């Protein structure tokens, strides 16, 4: 009898999908929308999904950065590969900090994958946890937050493209899918493949089974940011549109 009970418990356990470590690191229930530590120009705990003005863009489209002491050579190579995507396709330039007052400190010894949105002034941290965040796609995603971008699936027009199944969302975390009612249009249509789009099971009560984000187009399969290795052209276009004036100042 005892053996039968143990086998039954084991069968249930094996049938329960395991949340990938990369998803656990990205979907932090303690952070705004899972991976946003704060928003430039807004009080902690009172975030709205929008940067309020160009004052919170990086001057000249240049983002100085340093690596924290925890970042090893392999992690640096992954993060630098993510930065190269910006350099190859946008006017944004990540440069090693010298004496700049505003800069990113990129660390791998904090908890989870997260960033502030926009420049908050002074040193601002960007976390790419060793356990779950060392992916090129994740690095690009968090760096896009740092220069001022939000999640694609929270755009104000998202209901034309996806259905949010709130009945499948973990209790208390429906706010992670709040639409950006202050969304700033920067010239591109909704893109399911955006590096800023979450996957099908974001904040799901039952990973791998209970879908939370379902495309209205049945032919679309949502891919997690950490499973992508580049930004979409629409992402690059939005960056160049948002930073057109800032980057022009650099020339």
Name what the model sees in each region:
Residues 4, 11-251:
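Zinc-dependent metalloendopeptidases
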């Amino acid at each position: 009898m005892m053996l039968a009970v143990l086998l039954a418990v084991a069968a249930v356990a094996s049938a329960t999908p395991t949340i990938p470590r990369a998803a656990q690191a990205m979907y932090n229930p303690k952070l705004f929308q899972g991976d946003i530590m704060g928003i430039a120009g807004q009080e902690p705990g009172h975030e709205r999904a929008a940067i309020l003005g160009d004052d919170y863009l990086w001057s000249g489209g240049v983002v100085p950065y340093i690596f924290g002491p925890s970042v090893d050579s392999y992690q640096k190579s992954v993060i630098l590969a993510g930065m190269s995507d910006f350099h190859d396709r946008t006017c944004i330039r990540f440069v090693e900090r010298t004496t700049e007052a505003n800069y990113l400190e990129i660390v791998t010894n904090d908890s989870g994958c997260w960033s502030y949105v926009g420049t908050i002034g002074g040193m601002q941290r960007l976390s790419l946890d060793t356990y779950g965040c060392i992916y090129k796609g994740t690095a690009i995603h968090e760096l896009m937050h740092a220069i001022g971008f939000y999640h694609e699936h929270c755009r104000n027009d998202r209901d034309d493209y996806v259905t949010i199944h709130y009945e499948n969302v973990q209790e208390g975390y429906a706010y992670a899918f709040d639409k950006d009612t202050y969304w700033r249009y920067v010239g591109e249509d909704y893109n399911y493949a955006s590096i800023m789009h979450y996957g099908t099971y974001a904040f799901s009560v039952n990973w791998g089974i209970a879908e939370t984000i379902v495309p209205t187009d049945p032919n679309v399969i949502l891919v997690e940011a950490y499973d992508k290795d580049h930004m979409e052209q629409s992402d690059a276009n939005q960056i160049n549109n948002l930073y057109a004036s800032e980057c022009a100042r650099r020339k």
